[in-house]
Amino acid sequence: GFGCPWNRYQCHSHCRSIGRLGGYCAGSLRLTCTCYRS
């Protein structure tokens, strides 16, 4: 979701839009957008 696995930047932007520091594509096939705070 949110651009994963192909568009990592879209995931990162989504995470920033909800108040996180950024995000990356995670999971076995990098299908999940995972946000991080620090």
Swiss-Prot record:
Q: Which GO terms describe its biological process?
A: defense response to Gram-negative bacterium; defense response to Gram-positive bacterium; innate immune response
Per the record, the domain of life is Eukaryota
User: Which Pfam families does this chain map to?
Assistant: Defensin_2 (PF01097)
Which keywords belong to this entry? Antibiotic, Antimicrobial, Defensin, Disulfide bond, Immunity, Innate immunity, Secreted
Matching entries from InterPro entries are given as: Defensin_invertebrate/fungal, Scorpion_toxin-like_sf
Q: Which PROSITE patterns match?
A: INVERT_DEFENSINS
Disulfide bonds, paired cysteine numbers: C4-C25, C11-C33, C15-C35
Subcellular location(s) of the protein: Secreted
Any one GO CC term of the record = extracellular region
**Family to which this protein belongs:** Belongs to the invertebrate defensin family. Type 2 subfamily.
Q: What does this protein do?
A: Has antibacterial activity against the Gram-positive bacteria L.lactis and S.aureus, and against the Gram-negative bacteria E.coli D32 and V.parahemolyticus.
Mind telling me what this protein is named? Defensin-1
